[in-house]
Each structure stands twice: as structure tokens, then as C-alpha cells.
Amino acid sequence: MTEHTPHDASRRDLLAAAAAMSLAAGAPAAAEQPSSPARAMAGKPSIVFAHGLWADGSCFSKLVPTLQAEGHEVICSQHGLDSLSGDVDCVVRCFGQVSGPIVLVGHSYGGTLITHAGVDPRVAALVYLCALAPDETETSQSLQAKFPATPVFGHIAVTDGRIWLKRDGTPDFCGDLSPADQKLVWATQAVPVPDLFTQKHDGVAWKSKPSWYVVGKQDRTVNPELERFVAKRMNATTVELDSSHVPMLSQPAAVLDVIRHAARSIKT
């Protein structure tokens, strides 16, 4: 005899409702791209964000409302930091939720993600924020190893199979934010598996896509010299800010200007 719990019933109700909605819309509608109102915004490029370690999509919260108000479709990937390939796939899935062409923006490890995901033909431009940008022979780790380690790595702990940023590490991660905002950053951190930075993936988008790069001159998480190195290597339009590792939170107006320049370069 099979016992049905209230949870089972709720799940059946949810599945039934989803099936009914699909039938009501018709099978072709399920595969449609964004709706007509969304396509009405297609005169401007869409913006897709990819976060890094010890962050989630909310790290772009000071950018998203302004870009939306200016007529861009915007979405933030919420990847789990479980595997490089899985994170890249998560970013690519976001492309189907907006009308291209896409300005793909990556922060920190998110730069590795946009480097690989950005080879998708829907992506027209790349924006790197204090970000990694490995070549085809590099991993995130091997790229970092070419430069002196930064102070933040003295404030991490591996617990329960994840790498956590300790509370006392926030000054080296986001030290130009208020104490209250630093606490918020720590509380919303997404944490990676220990081997994430040693994993590899195909595709180097910055070799074929126009790129912009924001260097954080006071970055104590990704070495600013690494940032300058990869920006020069990709021939990026480069802006240096007197910021920590999180310029999108501490200097959002300047970061918005960079994204706008990238968007204006795209013919829609």
C-alpha cells in the first residue's frame, strides 16, 4: 500500500497546474522566445550578469534598476559554483530569457564564465569587472598563480566541502563599503567547491568579441596587476577605478557608464 503525504499532494497539484498552463498556452508557446512587450525593448541590447565567488546575483542590485529604466532587458545568472561547466550552462540558459544581442557582464570568477559562455552568437560584447579571463591553456587557478596572492586568501575556510569567506575577510573583499553593507555581502555569499578554479572549459570569447574591463586599483581579492594583464591581452577598453573588488557596489555610476558604452557599440 502506498502512503500519500500532504507533500505528495502538493507536488501533484503543482505538476497538474503546470500541465494545464502548458495546454492552455499550446505547445509552441512553451518554446517561444520573450513576449512581444519584451521584444519591444529590443531596440537596446540586453544585459546578462554573471557573479563570482562569495556573491550572488544581488551584487548587481545597484545596476539592474537603472539599466531596466533605460530600456534594457536584464537578467542575473544564479549559478551554484558546483562546477565550471554547470556554471557556464547556467549563464547560457539566461540568454534564452532575453532578446539579443547581449552585453555579457562578469564579476571576478564571473569573468571566467563570460569568457566561455560568451562564444555564443547571441553575445555581442563583454564587460569584465575586476575579473578573471583565462586563455585556452589556462584555468582560473593557473591564471591567478602568475601573480602574487592577495590578502583575502588569508581569510577563507574550507568547511562542509565549500570555501567560505570568513567574516574578518570582508575588508579585503569589499572594504570600501559601509560596515553594514559588508555584513550584507558576507551574509549573501555563494560558496564554491574547492576544485572549482582548477576546472577547464572550452571557448575564449574575448578573442573574437569586443571587450571592456574595469580595474579595481584597491582590489585585495583579484590582483590589480592580473586585471591589467588580462585587459591588455584582450585589447579591452579599460577603465581604472579607485575601488575594492566590488566597484558595482561602491561605484555603480562609473560601472554603469562602462556598460552603457559597451551597449552603444552594438548595432541592434
Outline where the language-model segments fall.
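Conserved loop-alpha-helix segment in the C-terminal half of the alpha/beta-hydrolase fold
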Residues: 217-241
